[in-house]
Amino acid sequence: MDYFTLFGLPARYLIDGNQLTTRYQELQRQFHPDRFATQPERERLASMQQAATINDAYQTLKHPLKRAEYMLSLQGFDLGNEQHTMRDTAFLMEQLELREELDAIERKPDAETLLAEFSRRLAQMTTTRTQQMVEQLDAQLWVQAADTVRKLRFLDKLQQQVEQLEERLFDDFA
C-alpha cells in the first residue's frame, strides 16, 4: 500500500496538511505498540512495524521535497540513491555563482543585509521551481518533474548553507 492510500489521500503533490495530520494521529492510536502489549509476539511485532511505516509515511508526505521524491519513486525514479549528473549547464553555472556569492557575503561588512537579500532571491527561485514541479507532477511529466526536483535539492542545500551562515553571523554578533 502506498503512503497516500495509507492516509486516505489522493496521490497528488498538493495535499491537505490537516487531513494528513488528523489521519496520522488516528493511525498512531490504532497501531500504537502499547495497545498490543498483551498480544502474542507476532502481533506486537506487526504493530511495531505498522507504527514505523506510519511514521515514515507521515514524515515523507509532510515534507514537500520528500513528498515529490516519493511520488516520483512510485513512477520508478529513485532520486534518493541515484548518481545522476545534472546536464543543465545554465543551472549549474547559476548554482556556482550563487555559492560564490554566498561565500563572499560572509566577508562583507554589511553581511546581514546582503544575506537577507540573498535569502529573498533564493526563496523566490525555490517558489518558482516548486510551482513548475507541481505543474509537472499534475501533468504526469515524470522526467521533467524529476529534473526539477533535482534542481530543488540544490536550492534546498543552498538554503541550508544560508541558515548556517545566519547562525554564524548571529553568533559573531552575540
Curated annotation (Swiss-Prot):
Keyword Chaperone (UniProt): yes
Keywords: Chaperone
Domain J: 2-74
GO biological process: [2Fe-2S] cluster assembly; protein complex oligomerization; protein folding
Pfam family, one: DnaJ
GO cellular component: iron-sulfur cluster transfer complex
Gene3D superfamilies: DnaJ domain, HscB, C-terminal domain
Any one GO molecular-function label of the UniProt entry: ATPase activator activity
InterPro entries: DnaJ_domain (IPR001623), HscB (IPR004640), HscB_C_sf (IPR036386), HscB_oligo_C (IPR009073), J_dom_sf (IPR036869)
Transmembrane segments: none
SUPFAM superfamilies the record matches: Chaperone J-domain (SSF46565), HSC20 (HSCB), C-terminal oligomerisation domain (SSF47144)
Quaternary structure, from the entry: Interacts with HscA and stimulates its ATPase activity. Interacts with IscU.
Its job: Co-chaperone involved in the maturation of iron-sulfur cluster-containing proteins. Seems to help targeting proteins to be folded toward HscA.
Family membership: Belongs to the HscB family.
Protein name: Co-chaperone protein HscB
Organism from which the protein derives: Yersinia pseudotuberculosis serotype O:1b (strain IP 31758)
Highest classification ranks of the organism: Bacteria, Pseudomonadati, Pseudomonadota, Gammaproteobacteria, Enterobacterales
Gene label: hscB
